[in-house]
């Protein structure tokens, strides 16, 4: 079979053009990891381009991709410098109160028949932050009937035993995290809480005139739980979604990220269906609670509550988790190839 010089030249020209185009495409095609990171960062912007979730995007979209490996041995536990670590407790809404530090939150939902507490700080913090904080707010710690522990890391479950033993509060936690508590060797220097209420998906905790709907969202820990409930702002009802666990400080492999991402997407749908306009959690640097609540003293009539960010912003919070989680997942896949 004869191939004319023209045909050969044309074929070579087409090959050269195609190769050049392919190379150009390779050079200009967006990096999928960076695309997800960019989408996560873009989702952090709030009203007037104010980055209302800057702390969240910094923690999970920047640090995880660049952070050094964790040391084999954990740092020793230390009683914190209370003068700098503990913040004044605040009345956040008509019936929701905040206590905590610049990085950790405990929330108290008041009802007709007592208090539902969300998360309990660390072992060394609970007495001062929770017991002392409730008293400063004019609330009685003995009226805490339920403690919902979003996940069993030491800075959320540390005060559960105190509330259980001293005040008889019922402790609610996911099954996987009760197992974590039971199996812990040295995570509870003052003793562990006794296994109590095991959270199930869709469970409702009702006290007086309030109900908290609980949802399983494994990922951050095996038994992480989130919640949906109602509060009031100057008499106006608002729906709150409580994000139970955010950071990627679990085993960094693809299956764990698949679990995390599935939970984020499910819980985002639950929040949207509930019409939630307030998103809070146990890490005050992620929802901005510690800073935002300081502005309440200067809030003017008709001005929006700093934590009532709107349904679109609540969706953006979950988008940050989703996009940044996908970025790290893709990086893990690339490393395994």
Task: Identify the residue ranges that each predicted region occupies.
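Active-site HxH/HxHxD metal-binding segment of metal-dependent hydrolases
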Residues: 26-47, 124-128, 132-204, 297-299, ...
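Accessory terminal helices/loops
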Residues: 24-79, 234, 245-337
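Conserved beta-strand hairpin/beta-sheet module of binuclear metal-dependent hydrolase folds
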Residues: 82-137, 141, 226-247
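Sec/Tat signal peptide C-region and signal peptidase I cleavage site
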Residues: 19-23
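Metallo-beta-lactamase
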Residues: 76-77, 91-94, 139-143, 167-170, ...
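Divalent metal-coordination and catalytic microenvironments
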Residues: 95, 109, 119, 151, ...
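Bacterial N-terminal signal peptides that target proteins for export
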Residues: 1-9
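Active-site environment of divalent metal-dependent phosphoester hydrolases
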Residues: 125, 152-158, 178-181, 222-225, ...
């Amino acid at each position: 079979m004869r191939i004319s010089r023209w045909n050969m030249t044309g074929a070579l020209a087409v090959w050269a053009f195609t190769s050049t185009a392919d190379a150009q495409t390779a050079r200009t095609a967006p990096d999928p990891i960076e695309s997800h990171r960019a989408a996560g960062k873009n989702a952090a912007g709030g009203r007037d381009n104010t980055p209302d979730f800057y702390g969240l995007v910094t923690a999970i979209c920047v640090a995880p991709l660049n952070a050094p490996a964790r040391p084999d041995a954990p740092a020793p536990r230390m009683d914190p410098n209370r003068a700098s670590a503990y913040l004044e407790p605040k009345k956040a809404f008509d019936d929701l109160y905040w206590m905590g530090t610049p990085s950790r939150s405990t929330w108290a939902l008041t009802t007709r028949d007592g208090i539902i507490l969300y998360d309990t700080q660390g072992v060394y913090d609970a007495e001062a932050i929770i017991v002392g904080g409730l008293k400063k707010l004019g609330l009685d710690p003995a009226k805490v009937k339920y403690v919902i522990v979003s996940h069993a890391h030491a800075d959320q479950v540390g005060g559960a035993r105190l509330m259980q033993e001293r005040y008889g509060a019922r402790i609610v936690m996911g099954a996987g995290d009760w197992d974590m508590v039971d199996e812990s060797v040295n995570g509870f220097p003052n003793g562990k809480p006794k296994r109590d209420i095991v959270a199930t998906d869709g469970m409702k905790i009702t006290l007086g005139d309030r109900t908290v709907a609980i949802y399983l969202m494994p990922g951050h820990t095996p038994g992480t739980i989130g919640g949906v409930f109602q509060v009031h702002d100057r008499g106006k009802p608002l729906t709150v979604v409580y994000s139970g666990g955010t950071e990627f400080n679990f085993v960094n492999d693809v299956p764990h990220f698949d679990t995390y991402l599935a939970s984020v997407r499910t819980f985002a749908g639950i929040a949207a269906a509930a019409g939630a306009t307030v998103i809070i959690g146990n890490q005050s640097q992620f929802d901005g609670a510690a800073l935002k609540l300081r502005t309440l003293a200067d809030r003017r009539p008709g001005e929006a509550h700093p934590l009532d960010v709107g349904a679109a912003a609540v969706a953006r919070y979950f988008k940050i988790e989703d996009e940044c989680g996908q970025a790290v997942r893709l990086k893990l896949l690339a490393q395994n190839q």
